Amino acid sequence: MKLTACIITFNEADRIDACLRSLSFCDEIVVVDSHSTDATRQIAGSLNARVIERDWPGYRSQKQFAVESASNDWVLCLDADERVTRQLREEIEALRTRGFAEHAGWSVPRITDYFGQFLRHGNAYPDRLIRLFDRRRGGWTGEEIHENTRVTGSVGRLHGHLEHFSYRSLSDHHNRMARYADLMARALYARGKRCGLSKVLFNPAWRFFRGYVIRLGFLDGWRGMVFHLVEANYVRRKYLGLYILSKGLS
């Protein structure tokens, strides 16, 4: 059974090489690039990826376009800052020999590198995502931000990690989450959602407490604390933005 890897990119020259090399076992690699101004497309092309340039419509739409551009029905979707580990690769290759027959899709545990150390507790782990699936029975859905995959049928569980090297610096993490929060506030408002001050005040505190205390995020040391503080600030900014829109104050 043939397999296509699907990735979307924009200015990922410093990370796309490692991502694509971890996908060398795939029969095809499709990279959909949003007009990068660095060497992303050249690097991808040199590693035998099929590169498609396309204007940016949003995360969900771009990822679904990549899936639809694949030559094979079974697809493995990655972000440019992710890498397939050896264990995960071996699991996928074993599935291929059976034609992926057992399920419509497979979830993988994603583990995030945070300033040189993988986070193994709290809200960051295990971050299970359906990334290997039959595109005839599933695809990308949800908001243009915080998109996800859904399949019609059963979902199996793989155990090898998908490594995530997302944040280049603390400011990068903070700025990215601030941007996501603003986008989500507008998306929620467009869907008719409204909120009061209680969510602005209490939801961030609960998110931090749940991740850092209940889910043992403190075991990741200072990295766990910083990660969950940034996450709590994301929740605060999201609901504050929705509150401002709800009151017509923007």
Where are these regions (language model features)?
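Cell-envelope/extracellular polymer assembly enzymes that use nucleotide-activated donors
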Residues: 2-4
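Acidic helix N-cap motif at the loop->helix transition within catalytic regions
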Residues: 17, 38-47, 87-88
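Short, well-formed alpha-helical segments that are part of the catalytic scaffolds
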Residues: 7-25
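Conserved beta-strand segments of alpha/beta enzyme cores
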Residues: 28, 50, 154-156
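Conserved donor nucleotide-binding strand/loop of the catalytic core
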Residues: 41-69
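Catalytic-site signature of metal-activated, phosphate-bearing donor transferases
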Residues: 64-67, 73-74, 78, 85-250
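A conserved acidic beta->alpha catalytic loop
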Residues: 22, 33-43, 79
